[in-house]
Amino acid sequence: STDEDPKYEDYKEIEILNSETPIWKKDKNDLTDEDYINFYQDQHFGFDEPISWLHFKIEGAVQFKALIYIPKKAPFDYYSKDYQKGLQLYTHGVKIMDRSEDLVEDAFSFVKGVVESDDLTLNISRETLQQDRQLRVISKQINKKISRHLLDLQKNEPEKYADFFKEFGNNIKMAIYESFGANKEDLQDLLLFYSKNEDKLISLREY
């Protein structure tokens, strides 16, 4: 191609956000449930409505914004080796990864969503990301937030949580098993068990 007539393929394909403020950068008080659900479906995170979502920002040594969804149903390939966990990762308004696996632990591989931090550099590679200290800090905060959100759901909306657990509970159990119990302390309160008369699911604290 010439300088006068450049071809699109000469440019690095990066997705830059348009001029409208993206949903995760907006104040959650200005957003409706419909806004969140529409974004979830527009991004093809799922066809139905999510069970719930968490929208937050962290300000500290590392700053970031996140919008994370708990799906209602597992995708068709969820239990196959083809399934890829991870959250979309943005920095400075540019998507640098479509699925950043290092942001969520295996126990929460079902979550969908977006994270943006301007503390990351634009030209960071997948290999560099795995070693990035700031990304590890972000990941730790995200997993803590997801765990707390699920515990709140269990406490405040037990029926909704029971539906979630029937869909994804095996994944949490597997994460405890595969870590040889190393993360049992963090995850055991999320587990549900059938009561003695097996008519309903209850938590370990209720058991």
Predicted feature descriptions by range:
Residues 1-207:
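Conserved GHKL (Bergerat-fold) ATPase module
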